[in-house]
Regions:
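An N-terminally biased module of ancient metal coordination in phosphate/nucleic-acid-related enzymes
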Residues: 1-72, 156-158, 170-226, 230-253
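Extended substrate/RNA-proximal surfaces in nucleic-acid metabolism proteins
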Residues: 51-206, 262-282
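H/E-rich (His + Asp/Glu) clusters that bind or coordinate divalent metals
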Residues: 253-265
Length: 282
């Protein structure tokens, strides 16, 4: 059975490969399907779809929406979205403008600390991309202001650090509604990464199920076998779909490979069959 990867980022957010390069790489490693799930943007999907038409691989239009729940940043992945929907594009444009304002504030804070970050220069450097904290980290390393991306987050951009600026908060329920409004399948991204105890996780899943979540990422690059079994148990208990992916970012996450994560990731094609069945019955 072939494998798939349902969580991948391109240069249109904080990945380092273009959509076309991702499709070609996915084909070269024999993936049956790949979902392009850039942060809060669908701008890379047309290029990916066009490229995939020349290769024997299914390209799934997707997105990863950033939300907040109980003071935690939380991501909702949308699979099989209608990326041509005009209202959806308008909502994403609003999110983009909010992120722009935040990025300008982050750049200003660096300048106040004596680190000359030019946001105009960054926009040229990452032209067409949704600029995230990962881009700030890459920029600072390139300019020689810090030695590593980890240093940026440890000293400046991690939550509560001096240059961190909180984003405008969107609730997961809104992200789920947005995804379902364009025929997509909403999935909770990497739940283990939110470091919740059983009580917190149950409360979260109650809330998400109430608002129409369809599945969760039970297979993920950094999960242990125990993590994967636990997530699959939660999915089965709540009659949710299982999704999975590498969360590949290219050089921005050098220890994560497309399709295989840290070497042990395998997302079976049968997972996609069940997601398609759900999609067809919406």
């Amino acid at each position: 059975m072939k494998s798939i990867d349902l969580h991948v980022h391109s240069t249109y957010s904080d990945g380092t490969l273009t959509p076309s390069e991702l499709v070609k790489k996915a084909f070269s490693i024999n993936l049956a399907a790949m979902a392009l799930t850039d942060h809060d943007t669908i701008d890379g999907i047309p290029e990916a779809v066009s490229c995939a038409a020349d290769y024997d691989i299914e390209l799934i239009p997707g997105i990863e929406l950033s939300t907040f729940y109980d003071k935690k940043e939380m991501h909702i992945v949308g699979l099989y979205i209608d990326y041509t929907d005009k209202n959806f594009k308008k909502e994403l444009e609003s999110l983009k403008q909010s992120r722009e304002k935040r990025n300008e504030k982050i750049a200003a804070r660096f300048c106040e600390m004596g680190i000359p970050v030019s946001y105009d220069e960054m926009k040229k450097m990452y032209e067409g991309a949704v600029i995230t904290r990962a881009n700030f980290a890459d920029y600072l390393v390139r300019k020689g202001y810090v030695k590593s991306r980890n240093e940026v987050f440890d000293r400046y951009l991690g939550d509560s650090k001096p240059c961190y600026v909180p984003r405008e908060k969107m609730l997961p329920e809104k992200a789920i509604k947005m995804i379902k409004s364009v025929g997509g399948v909403p999935v909770l991204a990497h739940p283990v990464l939110y470091h919740m105890g059983n009580e917190q996780m149950n409360k979260l899943m109650d809330y998400l199920c109430e608002h129409g979540i369809a599945g969760l990422e039970a297979v993920y690059s950094t999960y242990t076998m125990g993590d994967e079994l636990e997530m699959k148990h939660i999915a089965k208990e709540r009659n949710l779909l299982i999704s999975g992916g590498s969360d590949y970012h290219g050089a921005n996450k050098p220890d994560i490979e497309l399709g295989t994560g840290r070497g042990h990731l395998f997302v079976p094609e049968e997972i996609l069959t069940k997601i398609k069945e759900y999609k067809n019955n919406i």
